[in-house]
Every structure is written in C-alpha cells, then in structure tokens.
Amino acid sequence: SIITTIKRLAQSGVSNYSNTVKHWIDNSDYNISEEKKKALETMFAKSHVSVIYGAAGTGKTTFINYISNFFKEYSKLYLAYTNPAVNNLKRKVAATSDCEFMTISKFNNRYNNDIKRKYDIIFIDECSTVSNKEMKEFLELADYKLLVLVGDTYQIESIEFGNWFDTIRGFLPESAICELVKPYRS
C-alpha cells in the first residue's frame, strides 16, 4: 500500500545530506529564502521521501528547481497529473541534464509495458490530483532512490478517490515535511 511504502522510505535518510546541502547553499548563486534553506537542509536528513506542501504562489516549483540543481549530477524524473503541469515543470526547472518529464499515467503505462529505468530522484507535482490507485501503481512500478512529493492540499482534488497526499504527513519525520507558507505571487 501507499502508506507502507512511504513508511519504508522514511526509515532512514541520506548520509551527510545536511552538511552537503549547507555547503551547496553557501556556494550557490541562488537567493534562497530562509524558509526554503531550512527545508532544503533537512528534507533528506532522516528520510528518502520528502513532502512539500504549499498553496499556489508559495514557490513550490522554484523549490523543485533548487532541489534539482543540488542533485544536478543525478538522473531525475518529473511527473505530474496533467500535461499543462508537466509543461510548467519543463519551463521552470533549469537542471536539464539527465531529466525526463511526463504525466504519471504515461509513466505507469510505459512501465507496465516493461520499459524500465532506474532514477536517482523522482518528483511528483500536483500530488493532490493523483488518485490512490495511480499512486499505488506508481510506487509498485517505479525504481528510484529519492522521492519528492509536491502539492497543495487546497487544490482541486483527484477525480477518482485520492486522500493519500493529505494522509502521508502523519507517517514522515518532521524534517521530511516542508510547508511553504510565504506567498511570492498573488
């Protein structure tokens, strides 16, 4: 189940993650807010899954870009429920080497047809729109080291039954949950 997989991923973090990311932030040209710095420094310290919650305009996609650039040498997959959301990620994420972008249904269909690839890090945007069924299928098919789940719990919900994104926060260490609250656009 979704919760079982999330709990397994949350059992341990990436060794020396916090120190490495602090060094990257100190030497980066990005003007990263304190809110995002704190989240970046802890998100994978105790877990291999991290969740980013935030309303529209709080900088979730910008934050995805920071994470992507920190992990720029790694293979990355960006998923979203809709094609417009996938295209938005393509436009706004600058870490373009070894990246793939697609809808979660396209990913699930490809992998059901045995086109398998291992990724270092997978990002799923607009998680509140992904149904329990699609997420369960994704978790059964995907091969990855790190998982970043991004969304707005106030956004339109999944058309099919999908409460997993709101529920998983209770199964993660506090350091793996990032709640973006400061609005950057209105």
Cite the ranges covered by each PLM segment.
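Conserved ATP-binding/catalytic motifs of P-loop helicase motor domains
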Residues: 1-186
